[in-house]
Amino acid sequence: MIRFYLLIIVFLISLLSFLKAPEYHLWLLAVGVTEFPLIFFGISLLLTLTGFWAHKYQMAGTVLGVITMIIFLSPIVRAYWVSRTLRENMVNAFAGADGKEGPVLPASDTPFNFWNLFKIADTISYRTITYVKYTDTSMSLDFYPAQDQGAEFILPRPCVIVVHGGSWAGGDSRQLPELNSYLAFKGYNVAAINYRMAPKWQTPAPVEDIEAAISYLKNHSDELHIDIKNFVLLGRSAGAQIATLAAYTIHEPSIKGVIDFYGPEDMVWGYSIPSSRLIMDSRKVMEDYIGGTYSKVPQKYFACSPLEFVSRQSPPTLIIHGDNDVLVSPEHSRRLNLKLQQNGIKHYLLKLPWATHGFDYNLNGPGGQLSTFAVETFLKTVCAPTP
């Protein structure tokens, strides 16, 4: 009976592959279930095989175990389904962006590969640099130099500025660093920045920090081998709101594109439809960042809603969001997608049906592989590195 009860528990956990997590700790578990599926498949396999040859009363547990294993594998199956058309969709979406014909990808570049689930991401060393000093604080960035067969490039390369998440009040530049190393190995400089955070600092302080970071990187471009005409902003969650707001408002011609990982793009709508308090007190988070409730400072909510500043001059945009996100509703990305479409901006919304917030924690998981492919394809389009 213990085996049967354990299988029931594992079965209920497997449902996080399809259902939205109702509570914070279950959300964390959902990231593991969907992006490390083989681990949970292995657990259910062991439980299923235990007692498989025993008496007939074990059959119910065996059937439940088989069903559970199938559910745990579903993110992999769905990742293959999304990958079938991702390459073509990406190329078509960004063909002609910034005067380019679209990325030319070798046949070996596949959006999803089962065997990559077993890979461990390579890393490179970075150096920490102070990029701006204010009267009351200073901000730093972690710089990952573009690599050329294991050595730093000596020619100027594009630079990706990464803005971390953390509800505008937490996190730092060391968050999810695997993608930074991956992009550096692909020939892109990466600057993962720290920025001023709530509640001590409020919007638009982080956007000003991005401007300061771009200024610093331009001024030190010779030393860092940066192509000052090719910057791309990449943000996750709260960092995506900062990155897109900067891309759409500071009108910096060197910003060739912006990448939005599950960011809140409509702050007015987001405040009206808060997350479950069992997950996060999203209204309190927004009030700390913006400086008050919507009823008190409605103009500030409008002013920090990136989609309100989309225009025909906005840079190409890549949006990536999981349908099961319980921290930032995928409706934010759908709304931004519509606004970009209405303004004729080159863009693409990659929807991951099984994924939740933070799915890219595992770069080689189903969501991690697809999003990394999308990011690399986007970069090849909007700021192809100089050979």
Positions of predicted regions on the chain:
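C-terminal catalytic histidine-bearing segment of alpha/beta-hydrolase fold enzymes
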Residues: 2, 10, 14-26, 320, ...
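Short beta-strand element of the alpha/beta-hydrolase
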Residues: 154-166
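N-terminal cap/lid segment of alpha/beta-hydrolase-fold proteins
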Residues: 17-42, 101-153
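Gly/Ser-rich "nucleophile elbow"/oxyanion-hole loop immediately N-terminal to the catalytic nucleophile
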Residues: 155, 218-233
